[in-house]
């Protein structure tokens, strides 16, 4: 106990006030303002530079991104403010085990580029629900999946990131939580609505650089404050809150805090769950989530997509060092606030009786860093928040527009699709803000645990349907649909039980049903996956096999099938959705109106544009990327939606060797920290 109190700790007027009289000074605010201006400048530059007046240009950045902005965007989209707050908070509460998610992600992001992406490119798909529609036929799977993705985005991504970023800004500027959220969204929504995916990727590249510089700086200050890694390992176990009851184990650091692999029955992250149960949601996130896949599809070719995945995989080594370890340092320096164990005390400290570990990272920034660097770290947190939100907004609007709206209105003009996509972003924002109070009260005050629990209940069935669709040619629509429905039904039941039977505080008896109390969410992930695979297999074998058109170019074994040339269909005759599942480059599904503005629709809507328009109308058209469209403009020639899967042999070999090195690096980290 003496070691923890002897650590450098700023004087506090009230030991339970987490941020006493501590707010940003003029120098910090100047850095933050400069950051906002810089991001807006980059966002507006990319808005002007890139082609935003087509659906492909808006949703796929024109398909001409090189490897480094793709890799930076993959990392920035993954590491949002929820990561900074959540990983540091879980590190403070339970140790390094949460870093297993990051090391696991190294394998999954490589699987995306080397295994799944060639299938998506060969099948000429641009959204994940569209892949299932082409692979299995029909529309019920794609619609179910589109609705599920939007649900997951709202309840585990957007609201979590907004809450995490708002915690930081609320504590540093002493603003109301919701006012903080609205202020952040104003800038975020502006360049997402205006610029599309290109603006998102370019600003992500900038924000990745800012995140890394700021986070590495704070890591240096953190380790210096406790005497390096040796000091951290020694003092962490002495970081106890002063008001803890001597007869209680509440508030004690875990004995296995510095181990990734933990007891299979009694620990917070059992090792079988880490090895198997964790890999399944990770596979869903990196290989089938629209937010991530959309960035890789925007690459100019498969080699650039692989380069982006390699860059993201190497960057995934860093969160343990720049987030988890600093969170543990925060517990050492500020045990009474970060490690509070009494609900009344926690309520007083952070307005959350479940626990205050989520203030670990903001606490470090505001108490440890000098003026100027505090402003830089504020910029880092805002960068993390904005990069995640813009990515999710763009991908969610892509799914809604291309998979749901296009199903309802298959003949919708390109102009209509562009407007619908942008309006949906605004609707997403509203729903997500309303969900924040539920996030605030969930999972014992550990934000990252909340995210992973919901992921383990909803994502495994989807992941298994994708895996079977990609690697088992016999899987058919009936098997995939009923496997998905049964898996999601079980997942939603467990999710509802978790919200009804909230985990009790440390000193209270646990009277929850055994299925909630004794079945860890990672084990439940394994159960869901097994049920889904069994259902898909049995139903597929009992029903008719899929046609050749549903397999060609859409599985790993058929991705290189020869393309069957078909007669050109006149542009004025749109293909109905029923003819859209042959899987070739010429297969125009309802959602692939990315290639041309249909001549008939163009003429029908040309009368809407009057020769003279007010300045307000012209400004709105520019914001939506639809300015200056001539009514006499000839239809654009058809262009391939996605790149080829062919690669330069030398570049391919170089990438493969680099991939093996990255895998060896991941295995070393697993072994060293296991």
From Swiss-Prot:
Membrane topology label: Multi-pass membrane protein
Known catalytic reactions: myo-inositol(out) + 2 Na(+)(out) = myo-inositol(in) + 2 Na(+)(in); 1D-chiro-inositol(out) + 2 Na(+)(out) = 1D-chiro-inositol(in) + 2 Na(+)(in); D-glucose(out) + 2 Na(+)(out) = D-glucose(in) + 2 Na(+)(in); D-xylose(out) + 2 Na(+)(out) = D-xylose(in) + 2 Na(+)(in)
Q: Which residues cross the membrane?
A: 28-48, 57-77, 103-123, 141-161, 181-201, 209-229, 273-293, 309-329, 376-396, 419-439, 447-467, 480-500, 522-542, 654-674
Q: Which GO terms describe its cellular component?
A: apical plasma membrane; plasma membrane
Provide this UniProt record's keywords sorted from A to Z: Apoptosis, Cell membrane, Ion transport, Membrane, Sodium, Sodium transport, Sugar transport, Symport, Transmembrane, Transmembrane helix, Transport
> Which family does the record claim for this protein?
Belongs to the sodium:solute symporter (SSF) (TC 2.A.21) family.
Protein name as it appears in the record: Sodium/myo-inositol cotransporter 2
Q: What organism is recorded for this protein?
A: Oryctolagus cuniculus (Rabbit)
